[in-house]
Amino acid sequence: MLGAALRRCAVAATTWAGPRGHLHSARTPGPAAAIQSVRCYSHGSQETDEEFDARWVTYFNKPDIDAWELRKGINTLVTYDMVPEPKIIDAALRACRRLNDFASTVRILEAVKDKAGPHKEIYPYVIQELRPTLNELGISTPEELGLDKV
């Protein structure tokens, strides 16, 4: 299918219509010109919010996740233009606890607060939703540690 599209593009690139509608042959372009003429669009389906959440919860729930994968996942998640759902943060905090990485738990909570930006109601909501997990895992928030005053 791609080959047929490339051939059509190559033929279209080598001919042009004159002022009276007659087709004229032009110089034959190189293969790069034919390839550049093809537009490749993704026909894949868009990921729903539920699928996005499930993908990240599954990622952080991997039993063999290591510290590098944890940090990579957190860094990737932080680059998105949104605040992660509490269930994703819960899975990330549990992964931190499995790895005994307390510093990453604080960084995650700080990143969530930063991602909330001027919307002051988001961070307290996330903490409220995560409170049972924070208590279960013995994780203190940056505010409880006094890091918000530094």
From Swiss-Prot:
Domain of life of the native organism: Eukaryota
Keywords noted in UniProt: Acetylation, Heme, Iron, Membrane, Metal-binding, Mitochondrion, Mitochondrion inner membrane, Phosphoprotein, Transit peptide, Ubl conjugation
InterPro entries: Cyt_c_oxidase_su5A/6 (IPR003204), Cyt_c_oxidase_su5A/6_sf (IPR036545)
Sequence positions bearing N6-acetyllysine: 87, 113
Modifications made to the protein after synthesis: In response to mitochondrial stress, the precursor protein is ubiquitinated by the SIFI complex in the cytoplasm before mitochondrial import, leading to its degradation. Within the SIFI complex, UBR4 initiates ubiquitin chain that are further elongated or branched by KCMF1.
Entries under Gene3D superfamilies matching the protein: Cytochrome c oxidase, subunit Va/VI
GO biological process, one term: mitochondrial electron transport, cytochrome c to oxygen
Motif SIFI-degron location, chain numbering: 2-17
GO terms under cellular component: mitochondrial inner membrane; respiratory chain complex IV
A molecular function (GO) term: metal ion binding
Modified residues (Phosphothreonine): 141
Membrane topology annotation: Peripheral membrane protein
Entry annotated with the keyword Membrane: yes
Pathway annotation: Energy metabolism; oxidative phosphorylation
Transit peptide start and end: 1-41
Predominant localisation class: mitochondrion
Subcellular location: Mitochondrion inner membrane
Physiological role: Component of the cytochrome c oxidase, the last enzyme in the mitochondrial electron transport chain which drives oxidative phosphorylation. The respiratory chain contains 3 multisubunit complexes succinate dehydrogenase (complex II, CII), ubiquinol-cytochrome c oxidoreductase (cytochrome b-c1 complex, complex III, CIII) and cytochrome c oxidase (complex IV, CIV), that cooperate to transfer electrons derived from NADH and succinate to molecular oxygen, creating an electrochemical gradient over the inner membrane that drives transmembrane transport and the ATP synthase.
Similarity comment text for this entry: Belongs to the cytochrome c oxidase subunit 5A family.
Quaternary structure and interacting proteins, as annotated: Component of the cytochrome c oxidase (complex IV, CIV), a multisubunit enzyme composed of 14 subunits. The complex is composed of a catalytic core of 3 subunits MT-CO1, MT-CO2 and MT-CO3, encoded in the mitochondrial DNA, and 11 supernumerary subunits COX4I, COX5A, COX5B, COX6A, COX6B, COX6C, COX7A, COX7B, COX7C, COX8 and NDUFA4, which are encoded in the nuclear genome.
Protein's name in the database: Cytochrome c oxidase subunit 5A, mitochondrial
Native species: Symphalangus syndactylus
Gene that specifies this protein: COX5A
